[in-house]
Amino acid sequence: MAISSYFRLVKAGWVLMREGVTRLADPEQLPPSGQFAIKVLRMFEKGSVKQANNAERLTQALNRLGPSYIKIGQFLATRPDMVGKEIAGNLSLLQDRLPEFETSIAKEQVEAAFGKPCDELFESFSEPIAAASIAQVHKGTRRNADGTTREVAVKVLRPDIRKRFKNDLDAFFIAARWAEFFVPSLRRMRPVAAVETLERSAELELDLRLEAAALSELGENMEDNPNYRTPDVVWDFMSRDILVTEWIDGLKLSDLEGLQAAGYDLQELANEVINSFLTQAVRDGFFHADPHQGNMFVTEGGKIVAIDGGIMGRINEGESRFLAEILWGFINREYMRIAQVHFDAGYVPARHKVDDFAQALRGIGEPIHGAQADDISMARLLQQLLDVTDLFDMPMQPQLMFLQRTMVVAEGVARSLDPSFNMWEAAEPVIKDWISREVGPAAHIRRAANGVNALGKLVGDLPELAARAEKLSAEMAEVGEKGLRLDPETLRAFSGDESKSAKVTAYGLWAIAIAVGALAVVMWQG
């Protein structure tokens, strides 16, 4: 790990101090050493931040630090277990908006990708329509082979963004590893795994070909829904840095007055937002993970078009089943069923009792039944469910935390359309359909067929497996007789790596101490 990564952490700590982020910590809840650290760190604040609220301090600091920190801020908004509920709530207000870069630079990016002048590729190419941390969007016009023209959206990656993300992620990994080493209580939250998830997400988001594929997959999955779709991708105009899709003319879901004036039923739109999200998550295991109002348009006929496939979520069949079983259990007040699902998934250590966990779940679920529709929040229920994880020693599941954050966003959009929206009434048909398909007789027949196929494959592989086992047995016998031998080059490599690692650790200790000093007092309460 380059020494520059340590200095990036120091810089981040300095910016956080200057923007007054340490004021998110309550000194009264800190030990004397922490209270002293707060006083020292606040001496470096800018005078202008003293009147700002916590959300403003956080967003200003992360915007100053750049795209990578905006992304990690959005990610930590899904991890209240790591940063505390208040900080997570403040981070949820963080908007992925940055100043545009010049249109001339965007045109250069297009020309570099396709080897032709931008004016030959597009009959028109607008100034930026929207700009975020990863890319910005322009409106263009292309001439089709038959002479007609077509309006398109041209998404252009920011120049040098990959290099910047890589450098910042190196620093994030250092911070996560040291956090796990020095703060044992954080190990349950798996900060290194969280950064790995962020890294993978960034890799996918920084290749616009994968975003095109994601939009295509989501569109195919939702083909049977007449009220939801994604933009068509212009496949013959594709590169890693450029994404071209059809231009969507419609009303954003945030334009409530416009939607009402156009005669759309806001309650139906709210229901479709949740119906489509749960269908994606529960049935398909692949969902649009950034479903805010600006990413959804309503087109003629009331069809919702979801744009921006840069952030997608994927959960496996077991995790989809886990989600569906939980929601169905709460709908029907089957708390023992929910508890058993947690134990079957291995999320709760076997030393705990299923009955005790079911009792805790009852305390979460019962207040929901009989409550007013506008007091019922599926996202809040899932958050309360996460709150009991510490009591039952449950390790955090980053992919499920990501799903929970997305559900919070989707629910917020639905309630902005219809404040009295009933989440459970909207969820029940989707979950009921899943239960009938996955737990009913047809599902048992399908699983039995899959089992027969797997058994047949195993029988076919037996000769090869037997040969491998015989070879391994001979090699193990040789090791037992002669000992484990390493060639000289390998030994020298081990020695060199160890020496370099020791030097980097020694150089990094003080750098980490400075950076963590700015962050630890905030994390203490999380």
Which residues fall in each region the model found?
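Residue immediately N-terminal to the catalytic "proton-acceptor" Asp
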Residues: 140, 284, 289-291
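N-terminal accessory/targeting segments that precede structured cores
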Residues: 1-136, 142, 164-195, 414
